């Protein structure tokens, strides 16, 4: 409740109201009960499994990545203040924005924390890798070992509806 910083990697499923009022922490879980990410204002949450009902209710900031293997997450997510979108493949994103598809090696690594409106695939994969490192999670290993198959299933990225507009207007 109300974490402002730090990282949390939990191997297994958590109960109701996980990451409520999260305002800056990064957290990974393998499933969550009802009301996950409720009133979240910042930070990043990764859910590597099913969610309960009313996910993201009142969420006004941050990003949540949810593995949606069966395509039913939209029925359990409260869409009043958030939108769902696919996690773009990095090569597609680089090509569409910078015409540098397949060129990450040439340009070096990017700071994935400096711009929360881009770098979703790299950020997500990095966070799942840390989850595997700290928890030895079989779920994380399975996902990373078959990334090309799982990335599209992760295809749900949640951002507060005005997150990108606000970020652009403040710069």
Indicate where each model-derived feature is located.
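Long, distal/terminal scaffolding or interaction modules
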Residues: 1-171
